[in-house]
Design a protein with these regions (language model features):
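Acidic, metal/ion-coordinating pockets
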Residues: 30-313, 353-365, 375, 425, ...
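Intrinsic-disorder/low-complexity regions
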Residues: 5, 75-76, 491
Length: 571
């Protein structure tokens, strides 16, 4: 079954009939189906080997599963692509990014071994910094793509705009784009010398160039979500905007938004375009079958078809696992290192309803490192836990998922208030009585809350739910958005003044405009650099690790001084 049209169907059944046939052929040793198979991974976030190095447990989905498919089909009979965000998200890649920089990086090592043909850069790849992604680029035996990441000095793409691949008698062009929103999240130091241009205009610029190559197929490899029809190409997720408004693409592989989706659309020239979106962390493999063509004329084999393959339906390659067994053991040893001890178990779940030991530990570390007056921090995961007992390196990836830097910025008291109003507007509903929802969930057209994997789905990402430490305040959820927060004083009891200036500790994502908090506070993106007092040289997780090493023993408890009112509605 090939799924088109209704994206909801992909949640019910994402394995296609063609995949079922392919698996039968793998078992029987028969020849693979006619046509060219294109496979694409996206948003792997370090899930290269069958082991979750943060949880310390084996997993049934990784590139070990893909390795068995490559061996069966053969690299000459397939095009293999990656759609970015591979360099961040697991201790495995962190180790090779920053701890062991002398050996070949694990990402090009594995992708070269699997005969990848091309990859597009993602925003989390850029977040590792020039030293890392430039090194990875040098070590890859295939091109890294991003036509809209432009070298400021030359005016040409910093990475390759596209690549030409010839397989099974077909000439395939793969064109890469990265989400243009990178500057909204990352400090300029991480992409110095690069500007990010909007996607539709960039695709229009390069389409005539690519068509002069007389390809049989043009494939988009976009590290950007599908998005909406009304987006213009400068939005975070603009793949659909390109598909609809830039004729010439046959297939577009999407990513970044971690959604699973397949849909066929008709562009403004009346041509069909297939879009696939492939989730994250090697859960699924995007797949398109290209019928044999000559000069872009479809043969009698039919139209391009697509599917999402559940990665764990492919058997893992034992040869692949054995090849990288030393790497697996190295990372196990690295993540098992004891750095201290916690005298309490803490969870992010508490943080959604008031002060929590988990988030307040982040607050305390940020305030201690920065010396700031106030700290802003959020629960980066919905349901994360650090248990009482020995603290290991892997626990630091639970405490802080992202490789953000720590910034100290200047804000007035009024701006602090508006910042918090925005945060709690993302976070809490306006309640009329104690039976109303406190948290802002997503609701369907029938007014029922949306459930995903048995869990209510929040309207906004929890990493945007910033609370504050260093001040005493309440959040009145009976009042409308924008007028809920009342700041009584600083934590030491001294007055808090709207017109006074305070030093505030925030992560680099927030300090560069992520989440819209600073914009809501009245601080535009262009104003942000002038507000920066200082920034760390390394990621915040590194400093948290060293802070705990120095302390040796910690007792994380709720320490921030804020509460939700009316109390009898929320208790």
């Amino acid at each position: 079954m090939v799924i088109f049209g209704d994206p909801k169907k992909v949640q019910m059944k994402i394995r296609s009939l063609s995949v079922f046939i392919l698996l039968l052929l793998m078992l029987s040793g028969c020849k693979e189906p006619e046509g060219l198979e294109i496979y694409a991974t996206t948003d792997l976030h370090g899930m290269l080997l069958p082991f979750d190095n943060t949880e310390g447990t084996a997993t049934d989905h990784s590139l070990a599963n893909l390795a068995s498919l490559v061996k069966t089909v053969g690299s000459d009979n397939m095009v293999l692509l990656d759609n970015g965000d591979i360099l961040q998200g697991d201790p495995l890649t962190y180790y090779y990014n920053f701890e062991d920089t002398t050996r070949e990086h694990i990402v090009p090592d594995i992708l070269n071994h699997l005969h990848y043909d091309a990859a597009t850069e993602g925003n989390h790849d850029i977040e590792t910094g020039h030293a890392v992604y430039d090194r990875v680029r040098r070590e890859c035996s295939f091109p890294l793509l991003a036509a809209n990441a432009v070298d400021i000095q030359t005016g040409k793409p910093y990475f390759e705009p596209y690549t030409v691949i010839r397989k099974k008698g077909l000439k395939i062009i793969v064109f890469g784009l990265i989400t243009p929103s990178v500057p909204n999240w990352l400090p300029e130091s991480l992409y110095h010398g690069i500007r990010f241009e909007e996607m539709v205009a960039t695709a229009r610029k390069w389409m005539p160039v690519m068509q002069k190559e007389n390809p049989d197929v043009i494939v988009g490899l976009f590290h950007s979500g599908i998005g909406n029809e009304d987006e213009k190409g400068d939005d975070e997720n603009s793949s659909l905007a390109v598909a609809l408004n830039v004729p010439g693409f046959d297939v577009i592989f999407c990513g970044h938004d971690h959604n699973k989706d397949i849909r066929e659309v008709v562009n403004n020239a009346g041509e069909k375009v297939l879009l696939l979106d492939g989730g994250s962390r090697a859960e699924v493999l995007m797949h398109a079958n290209i019928p044999l063509r000559t000069k872009r004329e479809v043969s009698g084999n039919g139209e391009i078809t697509g599917s999402l393959i559940e990665m764990n339906t492919l058997p893992p390659s034992q040869a692949f696992i054995e090849k990288y067994s030393d790497v697996t053991e190295t990372i196990r040893e690295y993540t098992s290192e004891i750095i201290g001890r916690s005298n309490a178990t803490v969870t992010t779940r508490d943080a959604f309803f008031g002060p929590s030991g988990f988030v307040d530990l982040i607050h305390c570390i940020q305030l201690d490192i920065s010396g700031a007056d106030i700290s802003f921090a959020a629960p980066l995961s919905f349901d994360e836990e650090i248990k009482e007992g020995d603290l290991r390196i892997r626990d630091m990836f639970r405490l802080y998922r992202f490789e953000n830097f720590l910034y100290t910025v200047k804000m007035t008291g009024a701006e602090v208030d508006r910042f918090l109003e925005h945060s709690y507007g993302l976070w809490f509903s306006t309640m009329k009585n104690r039976n109303d929802w406190l948290l802002r969930y997503r609701f369907n057209d029938s007014g029922e809350p949306v459930m995903v994997n048995g869990r209510l789905r929040l309207r906004s990402a929890s990493y945007n739910f910033d609370s504050a430490m260093g001040i005493r305040y309440t959040v009145d959820v009976s009042r409308p958005e924008g007028s809920r927060v009342t700041i009584m004083s600083m934590s030491d009891g001294t007055p808090f003044f709207p017109d006074s200036t305070y030093s505030v500790a925030v992560n680099s994502y927030r300090a560069n405009g992520g989440g819209g908090h600073f914009a809501a506070a009245g601080i535009t993106h262009s104003m942000l650099p002038s507000r920066v007092i200082s920034a760390t040289d390394r990621d915040l997780r590194y400093y948290m690790t060293e802070w705990i090493r120095k302390k040796g023993e910690i007792t994380p408890v709720p320490l921030s001084e804020w509460s939700v009112v009316p109390e009898h509605w929320v208790t």
